[in-house]
């Protein structure tokens, strides 16, 4: 039921944001164009598995990769057709290459099985070159793989732990062998990219930068602020450090509700006020008026009867006519925001699909003023 997985399927942030404007540092609002992560990838072998590796008689590329590796070590490989191993697995190795990383530094890598291995638990990744989009080798990975422990759920029964046995990590598993080329510091201008496009914020950032460095910044659009920078690399670093720590007053953000239809997660960026409305969805009826909420859910296949006083009964149980004591009826005072309404709906064990349908209907009817995005 929905209420049994309320925390799993719904997130209303950690706290609902207020409507008051606040100040953020520029560094929290932008990224610097050209400073980013670069992706590296490589193909390798994991050995030392306890009978959970690829079935080499069916996965030919695992045996072929092992043959090539042993050949480079000067070892003659036996007939591939008769070779059967259970302790090796073919894997793809990926990592993110940060900017300004130098030779000898180490980064974490992700190891994922590409064959039919059942688990990478206890395996060791053999030396694997990691290449960029230009096919050049930038790092070499090797080490013991760490995956989720099967006993994690038993030790932490109140925490949901997923055991992805065919996917693991090697902490500091790759060593940088080549530095990535970057154009940072070679141009006379630098673009600051807003994480969320906003003309007001872009103009405010440009204004604040110009107060510190006159006539150096201009907002090109709602996303890009172009800054003129000195040619000297040391002066560039000093200037950017100063700019990143400038405080910017953030205007009131547009109210937004984001719904993930697959997971059921619902996130809002502020308190959403609700207008007067009445909604009927399947066997659920809801009325909101004068900051009061009434919700009723009928049982399947109800038998409704009316007496001479027009009192309605459901399966011989009175539920209407000023009776708020039954389990199928909720009456709440002073409810004017979306959070309260969802909590009330949760009491009726509604499904995620029903909740999304109700919110969509309320939005279409103008019951609340916020951007609704369903992904």
UniProtKB/Swiss-Prot annotation:
UniProt keyword annotations, A-Z: Bacterial flagellum, Signal
Family matches, as Pfam families: FlgI
MF terms in GO: structural molecule activity
GO cellular-component term (any): outer membrane-bounded periplasmic space
Protein's cellular compartments: Bacterial flagellum basal body
Residues making up the signal peptide according to the UniProt record: 1-23
GO terms under biological process: bacterial-type flagellum-dependent cell motility
Function comment: Assembles around the rod to form the L-ring and probably protects the motor/basal body from shearing forces during rotation.
Subunit: The basal body constitutes a major portion of the flagellar organelle and consists of four rings (L,P,S, and M) mounted on a central rod.
NCBIfam families in the cross-refs: PRK05303.1 (NF003676)
Record family assignment: Belongs to the FlgI family.
Name of the protein in its database record: Flagellar P-ring protein
